[in-house]
UniProtKB/Swiss-Prot annotation:
This is Elongation factor Tu. InterPro entries: EF-Tu_GTP-bd, EF-Tu_GTPase, EFTu-like_2, EFTU_2, G_TR_CS, P-loop_NTPase, Small_GTP-bd, T_Tr_GTP-bd_dom. GTP hydrolase that promotes the GTP-dependent binding of aminoacyl-tRNA to the A-site of ribosomes during protein biosynthesis. Residues 81-84 are annotated as: G3. Its main location: cytoplasm. Residues 10-204 form the tr-type G domain. It catalyses: GTP + H2O = GDP + phosphate + H(+). One of its GO terms (molecular function) is translation elongation factor activity. Keywords: Cytoplasm, Elongation factor, GTP-binding, Hydrolase, Magnesium, Metal-binding, Nucleotide-binding, Protein biosynthesis. GTP binds at residues 19-26, 81-85, 136-139. The lineage of its organism: Bacteria, Bacillati, Bacillota, Bacilli, Bacillales. Transmembrane segments: none annotated. Residues 19-26 are annotated as: G1. It comes from Bacillus mycoides (strain KBAB4).
């Protein structure tokens, strides 16, 4: 069969399957591709093809992830499925696989299990905004009341972590039976995807977000002024826009972009993904430095203290060989620069072992432009020893 070309005209959404080991995440992923393939919206992928996910070395960490793509009537999806629990932790904290929404798979025969809870918590911490539930293995449960109990348990668990548990769509099905081609269960997969289409909103495009550019380098051009270079992370910047210079300083400075240059050509505007030089009015070379960001006025603030979800590299991954304790002072690398910070561990946690993932409070020695969801790495003498994501800002 010739490989059908995916229509790029449909809105694109990134999703993934999450949930406890052996509850059927991979079987469900295979079932979705198989059922949608009948309508011409996917290439059917067998369980074995998905399960044998190649290990990816993403910045020195080994993560196994399966990527599949498929489409419904209205959308194009990229779907990630991870074989192991540790793969989810790494994936979600490093942002290797960005998720606009998740399908939480819970076995109706077993109910919520420890990793069900952990994945819901992780989704909350790293900012997966929407979750749809697939109660799997319903063919193995004859008791309607038992199914309702499991559904209630899952809804309560979601509410406990700040998701709207009462409103979340819950679909009862059997991934295995659907994969085997049984019509009544195939219907449930269609129902699941209809709910995913309706419930998980199309993400805002990067270009529609407020402008932000991390500053990589600064130089002055005689007679013209100071230029800050970097890659636009999000939004659009036009000549004449007023922007703020944020981070590493007591006060934010405000300036006007008087020129935008890319590949030595002058542009009227630049957008997310472009590598540019921005000419800034009235800014002295020494007033601006790498590690600061240029951003739309009022869109982001500099903070020094925050709570973060952190994954500490194991010795095998090139991380530390020994644990660290409270008041550990490594460097935190945000976008383009390292800033020293002090770690506070949660109550009752004495130390953190290589390979752990943990929530901690971090206080930087200088404020940096951050918001919930900002990713960073933890370094010691230029060597990466961990990755993290800002979960909440701590008011100072």
């Amino acid at each position: 069969m010739a490989k059908a070309k995916f229509e790029r005209s449909k809105p694109h959404v990134n999703i993934g399957t999450i949930g406890h080991v052996d509850h059927g995440k991979t079987t469900l992923t295979a079932a979705i591709t198989t059922v949608l393939a009948k309508a011409g919206g996917a290439e059917a992928r067998g369980y074995d093809q998905i399960d044998a996910a190649p290990e990816e070395r993403e910045r020195g960490i080994t993560i196994s992830t399966a990527h599949v793509e498929y489409e419904t009537e209205t959308r194009h999806y990229a779907h990630v499925d991870c074989p192991g629990h540790a793969d989810y932790v790494k994936n979600m904290i490093t942002g290797a696989a960005q998720m606009d929404g998740g399908i939480l798979v819970v076995s109706a025969a077993d109910g919520p299990m420890p990793q069900t809870r952990e994945h819901i918590l992780l989704s909350r911490q790293v900012g997966v905004p929407y979750i749809v539930v697939f109660l799997n293995k319903c063919d193995m449960v004859d008791d309607e009341e038992l199914l309702e109990l499991v559904e209630m348990e899952v809804r309560d668990l979601l509410s406990e972590y700040g998701f709207p548990g009462d409103d979340i769509p819950v679909i009862k099905g059997s991934a295995l039976k659907a994969l085997q081609g049984e019509a009544e269960w195939e219907e449930k997969i269609i129902e699941l995807m209809t709910e995913v289409d309706a419930y998980i909103p199309t993400p805002e495009r990067e270009t529609d977000k407020p402008f932000l550019m991390p500053i990589e380098d600064v130089f002055s051009i005689t007679g013209r002024g100071t230029v800050a270079t970097g890659r636009v992370e999000r939004g659009i910047v036009k000549v004449g826009d007023v922007v703020e210079i944020i981070g590493l300083a007591e006060e934010n400075a405000t300036t006007t972009v008087t020129g935008v240059e890319m590949f030595r050509k002058l542009l009227d505007q630049a957008q997310a993904g472009d590598n540019i030089g921005a000419l800034l009015r009235g800014v002295a070379r020494e007033d601006i430095q790498r590690g600061q960001v240029l951003a739309k006025t009022g869109s982001v603030k500099a903070h020094a203290k925050f709570k973060a979800e952190v994954f500490v590299l194991s010795k095998e991954e090139g991380g530390r060989h020994t644990p660290f304790f409270a008041n550990y002072r490594p460097q935190f690398y945000f976008r383009t620069t390292d800033v020293t910070g002090i770690i506070q561990l949660p109550e009752g946690t004495e130390m953190v072992m290589p390979g752990d993932n943990i929530e901690m409070t971090i206080e930087l020695i200088a404020p940096i432009a951050i918001e919930e969801g900002t990713k960073f790495s933890i370094r010691e003498g230029g060597r990466t020893v961990g990755y993290g994501v800002v979960a909440t800002i701590v008011a100072e």
